[in-house]
Amino acid sequence: MRVQLVSALAFFAVASPAHAEWWEAKTDHFIVYSESSANNAMEFAQKLERLDMSLRSLQNIKFSPATSDSRRLTVFRFGDIGDIGRLAGYSGVAGFYIPNLSGSNAFTPARSAGLDTGQLLVNRPDSRTNLDPQQVLFHEYTHHFMFQHFSAAYPSWYVEGFAETAATIDLKPDGSFHLGNPPQYRSDLLFGMLNVSVERLLASTNKPTGEDQYGWYTVGWLLNHYLTFDPSRQGQLKQYLRAINSGTKPADAAVQAFGDLGKLNRQIQSYKSGRLPGVDVKIANYSPPQVEMRKLAPDEVAIMKVRMRSKRGVDKKLAPDVARDARAVAEKYPNSFAVQLALAEAELDLADFEPQALARAEAAADRSLALKPDSVDAMTYKGRALLERGRTDKSQLPVARTWFAKAYEEDPEHPAPLYFNYLAYYYEGVAIPESALIGLERAYDFALYDPQIKLVLARQLLAEKKGTLARSILMPYAISPHESKGAKKMREVVDLIEAQKVDEARTMLAHEIDEQERKRKAGQDAG
């Protein structure tokens, strides 16, 4: 996996206890890799599955298990907060989430500094105002859940405020849960260190400052809580979000839905000082989550650091280190499927910056397939290597498509083979068959959280003169055009669509996609 920006800090400093065990805990919606005891890993996985049940109950979404591992969130649980921060590239990070076409990933600590593995599951009421890694993970999973199930456009304050509301869900022993507890770790900011008004949160078009971004989490949580639980405001939040998605500017949508924003600001300031309401929810037909447990083999443990670094994402500076470390492990475990697959991924990432790595990536994919011929990931990596060759030798593209077709036959719900199959036609410059177009749309449905699919699908829809559909896909980027250069560009594309200039919109979007790829491969920030 690739990223545009990541700290240059190498991930060699992960502190692991001697002879640490690693367990895989698999539930209906999660695959957890945990550096802990088996019981602790199982309890943790059950807790995550219960969070998913709670969110489904709140959003009236059917309880159904994922039928493809690509639809499950993979959670890497290891080390302490310091180790998580080193992997993220930012100190003090207690957990983070990376959406990805081939399967999204989250990272969370398995232990507190100085404590034995697993003690984060123990309640510590003397630490209420400390940042709780469990609540961070609940927050990040709520993002994944929202992006996976809803394609609508949401302003940043609501995305973070809703996730903060869900982060403090209290899971009860009987299977019920409580919604509405305040995030105590935000209390200092809410009661004196932050000066972000409702007007500024909802109506500003200025480039957001660091204080504004803190406001998304704090004032955003407070506003979402108030609009959710205060009887006098019932229905206003839905009205506001509907207006934004219909094309109303966020500032206008806020006034239409909430009225006087100054009055709203005064009301939430009073609201935060009182006793906050909440609700107890009982899940119908609740039964404890089932967990499949498997202890990782020595080769899987040996490649785990490489795998986590790849899943976190690499840039031009880090990719060579990750690939080098993958090769070192592969020398020790030449007949390990897990190791060869991780090596193929690392070399593919490196090939973005060093084309000579492409042959090594394809060779590792071939070895993976020899060890496990039905591996969807190995088939996809093989196809991706051929796809990249096809950028300069178009005769490789039909061959690449055969591998994506095989991967699709093995797992029809995995978005990556569908997406790359479409790209193989697009790069070849031939008429794209209906089956590939449908495949791209299915990939989008399976991976609503992936930003690149959205841009590519919007480009295709514009080529088909389907401006209204393309606009709906781009709106999540366009509603806050001040947040980044890329978001501003998406706003310009949407403006062209709304002006019925669909061809110009497609040209601009295609150029933006190409420019982002060029900058990424050059090791630059694509903005």
Language model: regions and residue ranges:
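Juxtacatalytic substrate-recognition/specificity segment
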Residues: 20-155, 166, 170-172, 202-210, ...
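Beta/coil-rich, acidic/histidine-enriched accessory regions frequently appended to metallopeptidases
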Residues: 246-390, 413, 469-472, 487-527
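TPR/TPR-like (Sel1-like) alpha-helical repeat modules
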Residues: 402, 462, 467-485
